[in-house]
């Protein structure tokens, strides 16, 4: 059974902007959603979506047929509280040459001020290559995983979701063979790191549950 679901809720960092058409999808917009962890660290997550996926009633846009999808997008402002459900996907960023992880939004709704934050990921895929087991400078044991999931855009194609497991899950997943089916639960996080003198950001699923028997 295929599974690729993410639900997030946080604060819009800046008003949505037009994005280039992706995998044949037209009328695509992009926004960055900020979600604050209990530790105070902010994860900034890229959301791509189409205007017709917005819940118009959550924006006070009534009757719904009086507003075009573009009208609805313009009602989402910097600082808006937003809920998004959809799938995790990747695309090649030709400006940087890197793969960009993003949420492909299937449903968006504006939330009341002060609403609770959300960051929950559930995926089932298969291990692409040999996992990498490592120890962080703070002494934590982590395993890096590359997990293949189906493309949301092209039947028969896949995309690669970078994931990490930690603690006992890191030990459990460290020696899984490529092709092994795996189920992961966790959250999507952004993480800064240094490459030489350059500060870069990467995105990954931080999995709190890992199972090869689901």
Provide a role label for each language-model segment.
Residues 1-214:
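Single-stranded nucleic acid-binding surfaces, predominantly the OB-fold ssDNA-binding core
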């Amino acid at each position: 059974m295929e599974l690729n679901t993410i639900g997030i809720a946080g604060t819009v960092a800046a008003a949505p902007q037009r994005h280039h058409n992706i995998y044949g999808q037209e009328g695509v917009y992009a926004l960055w959603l900020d979600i604050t962890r209990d530790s105070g660290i902010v994860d900034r997550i890229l959301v791509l979506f189409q205007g017709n996926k917005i819940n118009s009633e959550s924006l006070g846009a009534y009757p719904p047929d009086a507003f075009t999808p573009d009208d609805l997008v313009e009602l989402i402002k910097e600082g808006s509280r937003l809920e998004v459900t959809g799938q995790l996907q990747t695309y090649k960023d030709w400006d940087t040459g890197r793969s960009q992880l993003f949420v492909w939004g299937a449903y968006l709704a504006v939330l009341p001020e002060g609403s609770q934050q959300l960051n929950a990921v559930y995926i089932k895929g298969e291990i692409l290559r040999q996992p990498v087991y490592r120890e962080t400078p703070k002494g934590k044991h982590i395993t890096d995983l590359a997990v293949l999931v189906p493309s949301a855009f092209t039947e028969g194609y896949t995309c690669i979701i970078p994931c990490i497991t930690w603690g006992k899950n890191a030990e459990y997943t460290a020696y899984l063979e490529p092709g092994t089916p795996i189920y992961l639960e966790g959250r999507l996080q952004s993480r800064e790191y240094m490459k030489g003198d350059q500060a870069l950001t990467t995105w990954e699923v931080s999995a709190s549950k890992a199972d090869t028997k689901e």
